[in-house]
UniProtKB/Swiss-Prot annotation:
A Pfam family it matches: TMP-TENI
Positions contributing to 2-[(2R,5Z)-2-carboxy-4-methylthiazol-5(2H)-ylidene]ethyl phosphate binding: 143-145, 175, 195-196
Protein's recorded name: Thiamine-phosphate synthase
Lineage of producing organism: Bacteria, Bacillati, Bacillota, Bacilli, Bacillales
Cofactors, names only: Mg(2+)
Similarity comment: family membership: Belongs to the thiamine-phosphate synthase family.
Cellular component annotations (GO), alphabetically ordered: cytoplasm
Organism, scientific name: Bacillus licheniformis (strain ATCC 14580 / DSM 13 / JCM 2505 / CCUG 7422 / NBRC 12200 / NCIMB 9375 / NCTC 10341 / NRRL NRS-1264 / Gibson 46)
Amino acid sequence: MTRVSEEAMKDLLSVYFIMGSNNTAGDPLTVIEKALKGGATLFQFREKGEGALKAGDQTAFARQVQALCKQFNVPFIINDDVELALELDADGVHIGQDDDKAADVRARIGDKILGVSAHTLEEVLKAEKDGADYIGAGPVYPTETKRDTKAVQGVSLIQEIRRQGIGIPVVGIGGITVENCVPVIEAGADGISVISAISKAADPKQAAEAFSEKVQATKQSAHS
């Protein structure tokens, strides 16, 4: 296995769907399948918070989700659990600033995809140096899903990353909807990451399709 290229990573980040079993009132596997059908390009398994599955149940559910992702040829990333990622041979790991250090995680996961959440330029540069393949920059907008989030910062960090000429792939994170996703891409992000705007949508497939269309159109016009 070799490290994912910067260009490939930028494409994968287009519509990054993040979900756990407790992020929907519907059947989780059905919701995930619909999102993948609708055009989600990357998936992150994030089983956290109230009502989340524990230990064995979590692993069993993760395996089912991983199988779905394989079916749609979408990389399967695990949030903040290196052991589980190694046990399942997941495609990668995403960590926050409070989790294990990025350099340690990189050493453990080899060439798998490594994503790191960052809230300041300093954190971005450190993550890049430590071997991150992409940055999750945010929170861009207010979010209900993560109760412990840092201060909302709009697209300022994304703009600053690009102004400084930092080329690492970046995905916007936090409170992103179909209605407000365009400025995130215009600021220089390679994609948007979404939980509830897809997981709680009346039609997750349609929601994923709408994100996909908006993101691709905005990326094309930004590069033309």
